[in-house]
């Protein structure tokens, strides 16, 4: 699960310009472009350096909705989610690949098993072949690959977030309930993604692995913020969006790797994208089933997720040198992903349109409250709005000089931002 988000995926252009002391230089036009696109992909995290997070108060919560009504709605959501355990057993668990037939990172990398001279020679030859392919990969694609790998490596955070969703969580760590088995199986399959990308990058010799590893360390330490993390509705919607975004991101990276002659990397990203596609199918089907059972609750939850923006799982990544907001490492990485075509504003608009159509939001009628109908109207008009904003951002960007940024991941080499 990585996206520059969605994600896994992607925010906007930034202007962390290339200069020896890493100071920021930006034009007002570029800053406006960043803010516009940043609003499309994800809201800034509350816990930014030098700023206190908003404080939850009972008064604020009560102002949003009467406490008894909100609590009752949450209990109903949890019970509906729990009622799907048999459905999950029949429809979602078969999407997970049995371990004995699943691919493993070792399948795509030179064999490092100890042995005689022939084994060592074969390993050395395999690494040389991998490095020859990696040598042709442009720096902007490497930045996207590292950003996706860093996000994948923060898997412990995502499993802990999954276990906060009431009705879906693994309450004991070994629960036999289908929802819990799905979460553990999903985690096990996702764990291979970061492992495989990490080992490829290590063997490629193209990146500063210590800086990359320190970025993973910081992301795990910093954590992740998510709208309504205890809500099963929000959690399943978020999962569907994230998995589709990562499928798109890894798929585009595979295409770019192939175009630049790295067949090994193309195969690696392709097999990861295929996993994300299966996982997307699970979360999408589960969300679709909930739309059938509680169309009003799901329409309002989907609108909540869209209004709050789909916060990227890697949004709090840091290499220890970056700033806040448009100068953050995540914003710069996302700007490169936009320019490289790994994950773009157009992809995000297509993604929103896909789910609104897939869950038949426009066709919802019976059972919608006034708030549900307002959510429906908002959702059905969202994709066209995103596309208009994207077109405006690109017209503005065309009138300004592209910025450059240095990335510690690639030994401070400069890369052009979107």
Swiss-Prot record:
One of its GO terms (cellular component) is chloroplast. It is found in: Plastid, Chloroplast. Coiled coil: none annotated. GO terms for molecular function: metal ion binding; stearoyl-[ACP] desaturase activity. Keywords: Chloroplast, Fatty acid biosynthesis, Fatty acid metabolism, Iron, Lipid biosynthesis, Lipid metabolism, Metal-binding, Oxidoreductase, Plastid, Transit peptide. Its EC number is 1.14.19.-. Fe cation 1 binds at residues 152, 190, 193, 276. Residues 1-70 form a transit peptide. Pathway: Lipid metabolism; fatty acid metabolism. Fe cation 2 binds at residues 190, 243, 276, 279. InterPro entries: Fatty_acid_desaturase-2, Ferritin-like_SF, RNR-like. Homodimer. Introduces a cis double bond in the acyl chain of an acyl-[acyl-carrier protein]. This is Acyl-[acyl-carrier-protein] desaturase 4, chloroplastic.
